[in-house]
Amino acid sequence: MAATLPLLTQGIEPVSGESYSPPGERHVQATWGSKDGNISNTEWNDPEANRLPEKVAELEKKGELNNSHPRRRVVVVGLGMVGVAFIEKLMKYDIKRREYDIIVIGEEPHLAYNRVGLTSFFQHRQVENLYLNPQEWYSSMPEDSLHYHLNTLVTEIDSENKTVKTSSGQAVSYDILVLATGSSS
C-alpha cells in the first residue's frame, strides 16, 4: 500500500516538521480567494467556498439542510483573516450536514477586515470597504449556525470545563475551541 502524503498547506507539516512554505521543497503556492470566486491559482482552491450565502438559500429552498440532530459548538477566538478563513472553510464543508454551530468572539468592534488595506482606509475612512465579508454574509448562514460577538475580549480558557470567559464575565461553553488571535508586535 502506498504511503499517504499529508495535505499540503503553507507552513510546517505537523508530523515531519518539514517546511512546505514557499520556497519550500514542494513549491506550494499561496492561495487567496476573492469574494467573487474568480481566483483559483491551484487545483486545491475551491471558488465555491466564497458563494456560501447562495448555497444556503438554494439548500433551504430544496429542503436539504439537516437540522434534525444535535450539533457540536465550535468557539473561534479571533475574528481576523485567519479566523474568518477558518469559519468560511468549516461552513463550506458543513453546510449540508449541519454538524457544527459556530460562535466567534472578536476583540475589535468591527467584523473581520483586511488589515493589509488599512492604508486605503485613511484615504476613504469607511471601514466597511475593508470587510472581508459584508455584514449580510454573517446573517445569511443557516439559522443558529453562526453567531459573533464583537468588542469582546476572551480573558480565560477553562479547558477542563470546556468554557471561555470574556471580559464582561460571560462564560461560553464549547465542544471545540479554535484560537485564531493573530499576533501583535
Curated annotation (Swiss-Prot):
Record bears the keyword Protease: no
UniProt entry tagged with the keyword Oxidoreductase: yes
Keywords, sorted A to Z: 2Fe-2S, FAD, Flavoprotein, Heme, Iron, Iron-sulfur, Metal-binding, NADP, Nitrate assimilation, Oxidoreductase
Region (Disordered): 14-47
Pathway listed: Nitrogen metabolism; nitrate reduction (assimilation)
Reactions catalysed, as given in the entry: NH4(+) + 3 NADP(+) + 2 H2O = nitrite + 3 NADPH + 5 H(+); NH4(+) + 3 NAD(+) + 2 H2O = nitrite + 3 NADH + 5 H(+)
Residues annotated for FAD binding in this entry: 72-107
Requisite cofactors: siroheme; [2Fe-2S] cluster; FAD
Protein name per Swiss-Prot or TrEMBL: Nitrite reductase [NAD(P)H]
Provenance organism: Leptosphaeria maculans (Blackleg fungus)
Protein encoded by which gene: NIIA
